[in-house]
Regions:
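Metzincin-family zinc-dependent endopeptidase catalytic domain
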Residues: 1-91, 152-153, 166-168, 172-180, ...
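Extracytoplasmic
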Residues: 34-38, 93, 134, 148, ...
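Conserved "repeat-terminator" motif of extracellular CCP/Sushi domains
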Residues: 40-41, 119-120, 124-130, 231-238
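Beta-strand-rich domain onsets/edges
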Residues: 110-135, 143
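A short, amphipathic beta-strand motif
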Residues: 135-143, 173, 233
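Structural motif
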Residues: 139-151, 156-159, 223
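Structured interaction patches on ligand/partner-binding surfaces of diverse proteins
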Residues: 192-232, 236-237
């Protein structure tokens, strides 16, 4: 409800059988400012607040960290791997708390922010040193000479192994990945195939999925406090 308060609490939502929690917003449509945000945790699931987690129970802190990411304006990250199990998906690995699918019960890994989460939050709310101490990679993803929308682009730091991702967000196939540590990065493009499309984009978004995952032909150097300059990656249809 719109009451001017930000509320966190438990609520039984049996029809949301795959949803551990959710965050709702009241947004000023003129400025984009978040006026109010409420978080609920689905009480139909077994929960735990044990320091080391508990077998058969979902970790409340991990889910809260994810939902608070939405609370401050973060969307979902696609840095994760899943496998199909029945009618759903099971996470096999991920490097972002903001990946849309939780680890199985007993896991507490998502209590700790990953580089992709930190880069996203810092991009929205930059500290005094953020823009000066990090850099970015920008460019385009092309399929048969045309830009594609919704491709997942990642930057992997050779120095630290940190991974930060982003998406192509227009019909020209343009992307920007900010919050990167200076140095050489491997840039990779892949289709969104480890989560439901509507976890990342609206139902009517024209997301391109029919292409082969591709790595940029050369390493990309990220300068401190600046941008790599445009990087063009050409992908092939599959």
């Amino acid at each position: 409800d719109e009451d001017g308060m930000n509320t966190l609490g438990f609520q039984e939502e049996p029809e949301l059988e795959r949803v551990l929690g959710a965050t709702g917003f009241t947004v000023d449509t003129l400025t984009g400012r978040i006026l109010e945000s409420d978080i609920f945790f689905n009480a139909i699931f077994p929960w735990s607040v044990a320091q080391s987690g508990a077998a058969g129970r979902f970790d409340l802190e991990s889910t809260a960290v994810h939902e608070i990411g939405h609370f401050i304006g973060l969307g979902h990250s696609a840095i994760g791997e899943t496998e199909l199990v029945g009618t759903g998906r099971r996470v096999t690995a991920k490097q972002a708390v903001m990946f849309p699918i939780a680890f199985p019960t007993g896991n507490i890994s998502d209590r700790v922010l990953k580089p992709d989460d930190i880069a996203g939050a810092s991009d929205i709310y930059p500290g005094g040193d953020f823009s000066r101490s990090t850099g970015s990679i920008s460019g385009r993803v092309l399929l048969a000479g045309r830009g594609i929308f919704g491709a997942h682009v990642t930057a992997f730091s050779l120095a630290s192994g940190r991974i930060v991702g982003g998406f192509t967000l227009d019909g020209e196939g343009r992307f920007v990945i900010a919050g990167l540590e200076p140095g050489l990065h491997v840039v990779r493009v892949e289709p969104l195939d480890d989560g439901d499309i509507d976890s990342f984009f609206s139902d009517d978004a024209d997301v391109e999925l029919d292409f082969i995952a591709t790595t940029a032909p050369s390493l990309v150097s990220v300068p401190r406090g600046g941008s790599s300059g445009d990087v063009t990656i050409e992908v092939r249809a599959r």
